[in-house]
């Protein structure tokens, strides 16, 4: 018996829609990252993108525990000396709610070309409307 290795052209990808309203950010992000990688499938192969497409709605209503709303900081650097920027969770969720989920999931995916391909299958929307109805996404309860 030989070990099964998935081929990129034979991978069947499904579309799922996830409602983030009231869900804890970290618990939601780990399950999304797991499904983007394809680790929930029996034909998972580490060097092949076997994951599904995930559409996240209501990103603006995601929850964090404790006092992370004020205390959790997101940092970025401009590349210039002294160019470090920081923004708190509550300011980022008010300004760009999609970025909160995207940053959490991206940090859980592999670095490199394969991780970037997996990340492109994540679609995040602040409200309840999304434009992927033609793909007939299934509801995913997390």
Swiss-Prot record:
InterPro entries, sorted: Ribosomal_uL13, Ribosomal_uL13_bac-type, Ribosomal_uL13_CS, Ribosomal_uL13_sf
Protein keywords: Ribonucleoprotein, Ribosomal protein
SUPFAM superfamilies: Ribosomal protein L13
GO biological process: negative regulation of translation; translation
Keyword flag Ribosomal protein: yes
Molecular function via GO: mRNA binding; structural constituent of ribosome
UniProt similarity note: Belongs to the universal ribosomal protein uL13 family.
Protein function: This protein is one of the early assembly proteins of the 50S ribosomal subunit, although it is not seen to bind rRNA by itself. It is important during the early stages of 50S assembly.
Protein name per the record: Large ribosomal subunit protein uL13
Biological source species: Idiomarina loihiensis (strain ATCC BAA-735 / DSM 15497 / L2-TR)
Taxonomic lineage of the native organism: Bacteria, Pseudomonadati, Pseudomonadota, Gammaproteobacteria, Alteromonadales
